[in-house]
Every structure is written in structure tokens, then in C-alpha cells.
């Protein structure tokens, strides 16, 4: 992960926004987008009560997960140029099989660093859903780029920023696969990794539509009636609009 001046991938909406690789200087402001959008509005965050004001420890746990994830150097953000604000983010993680006998990244983080029951439940959801399809083994791949957290500030919604971040996550991953300039932002110890796909857990109708529009293949669907936390099923907290999550993949 570079310190500053991340790669400019595109300008958007007649030059009103720019999309860049996330660097250390962008990280804390990017985490605020999670605080002000993702943790409040994302379906599984609601199911795990991470959206409730008193669950600050859960949000801190997941921001630490995002800080570590960002160190890979494959995360992206969108900046609104007139205000200078970061308004949308994609926290992306290079995922690969750990050495024999070691835990995967999510399992290791869950076991060693998570303190909040709400964050533990969200991590358990992610781990369980990822485990339903062994993407690396089943599709004969050594590495994928996981689009872990995708978020846009509500006041900048419906401008296609999430879709564009998803498209450029694919483009960035393809550039790394081909040994291109995106490698310059990747952590040095990961520069031998070559993602052969982008995968994601789409958790709302909005992200289902993004995945469909961009061309992701749905590998598995799980209704929210199958998950519980603190005496309630996820669907009871999420509401009727978003009924299930999807594990999806875009093969490069």
C-alpha cells in the first residue's frame, strides 16, 4: 500500500468525481464512509445489530479488519472533487489458501482480534458463506480478489458509484493478473499473487443488481431466514426488501 497519490483510474459523472487506488493517506477518511453508510445500512450489519448506536466496539472491530485489508493495496475509493470528500469505497482483499495447518485470513482475524459479539456474528456469516463454495479449489485458482465491503454515502447514492467501483475492482484485478502498473500499490509481500477472479457476498437487492449488471456469476444464494443473532432471525431486522445474500464470482 502506497503512502499517498494512489493511481487515478477514472473520472466520473462529467468530471465531478475521481476514482483512485486507496493509499495510507486516504484510509481514515475511507473508514468514515463505513461508519456513515455501511455499518448503518448494510443488510448483515442490521442483522447483527452493528447499526445500533451502542455497538461501537463492533464497528471498531470491523474498521480494524478494513485497515488490515487495505494494506494489501487493492482497495479503491471515489472522491467528490468539489467538496474534496471521499464518498464511496471498495475495501478489497487478496485471498489465497493459507499454508497447511493455518487458518484463512477471516478465521484468523475473527479468532484473534474480534471482541464484539455483533462483529463475531458478522464474521461467522462471512466465513460460513465463503465456505459453502470453495472458490479456489472448485475453480482451480490460487488467488482471488474479494470485494469485501462496498459502501456509498447516502447523499451520493443512485449515481452508479458502487457499480463503477465494482467495475474497477475487476479492472484492477485483471491488471494485477497481467503484471501491470496496479502492482505498484500492492504490498510487496503479495506481489507474486495473481487474482484469477473477483468474488463478493452481495447482501441487498442493490448489490444483487450491481453484480448482475457487471456480469458476476451467482454461485450460491442463502435466505436471511437461515441466520440468527440475539434472539432474532436476520430477516426480522433487515425487513422484506432484501431477502437473501449471494456468493458471486467474476472470472477474469
Where are these regions (language model features)?
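Conserved active-site alpha-helix within GNAT-family acetyltransferase domains
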Residues: 177-196, 201-228
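Short amphipathic alpha-helix that is part of the acyltransferase structural core
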Residues: 2-64, 69-132
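C-terminal/domain-terminus segments
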Residues: 162-177, 192, 217-240
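Short hydrophobic/aromatic beta-strand or adjacent loop that forms the aromatic wall/cage
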Residues: 73, 242-248
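Extended hydrophobic secondary-structure segments that form protein cores and membrane-embedded regions
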Residues: 19-21, 90, 146-147, 191-202
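Conserved acyl-donor/pantetheine-binding loop and adjacent beta-alpha core of acyl/acetyltransferases
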Residues: 45, 85-157, 183-187, 220-243
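Ligand-binding pocket scaffold of soluble enzyme catalytic domains
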Residues: 19-22, 30-32, 153, 160-165, ...
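Conserved acetyl-CoA-binding loop-helix of GNAT-fold acetyltransferases
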Residues: 149-152, 158-185, 213
Amino acid at each position: 500500500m502506497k503512502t499517498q497519490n494512489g493511481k487515478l483510474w477514472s473520472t466520473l459523472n462529467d468530471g465531478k468525481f475521481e476514482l483512485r487506488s486507496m493509499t495510507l493517506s486516504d484510509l481514515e477518511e475511507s473508514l468514515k464512509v463505513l461508519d456513515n453508510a455501511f455499518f448503518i445500512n448494510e443488510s448483515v450489519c442490521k442483522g447483527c445489530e452493528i447499526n445500533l448506536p451502542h455497538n461501537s466496539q463492533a464497528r471498531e472491530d470491523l474498521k480494524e479488519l478494513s485497515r488490515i485489508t487495505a494494506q494489501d493495496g487493492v482497495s479503491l475509493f471515489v472522491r467528490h472533487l468539489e467538496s474534496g470528500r471521499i464518498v464511496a469505497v471498495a475495501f478489497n482483499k487478496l485471498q489465497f489458501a493459507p499454508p497447511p495447518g493455518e487458518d484463512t485470513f477471516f478465521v484468523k482475524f475473527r479468532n484473534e482480534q474480534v471482541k464484539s459479539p455483533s462483529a463475531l456474528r458478522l464474521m461467522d456469516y462471512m466465513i460460513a458463506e465463503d465456505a459453502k463454495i470453495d472458490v479456489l479449489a472448485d475453480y482451480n485458482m490460487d488467488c482471488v480478489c474479494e470485494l469485501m465491503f462496498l459502501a456509498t454515502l447516502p447523499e451520493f447514492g443512485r449515481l452508479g458509484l458502487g457499480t463503477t467501483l465494482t467495475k474497477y475492482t475487476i479492472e484492477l484485478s485483471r491488471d494485477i493478473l497481467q503484471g501491470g502498473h496496479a502492482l505498484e500499490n500492492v504490498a510487496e509481500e503479495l506481489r507474486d499473487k495473481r487474482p484469477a477472479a473477483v468474488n463478493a457476498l452481495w447482501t441487498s437487492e442493490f448489490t444483487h443488481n450491481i453484480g448482475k449488471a457487471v456480469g458476476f456469476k451467482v454461485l450460491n444464494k442463502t435466505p436471511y431466514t437461515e441466520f440468527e443473532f440475539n434472539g432474532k432471525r436476520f430477516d426480522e431486522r433487515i425487513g422484506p426488501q432484501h431477502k437473501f445474500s449471494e456468493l458471486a464470482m467474476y472470472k477474469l
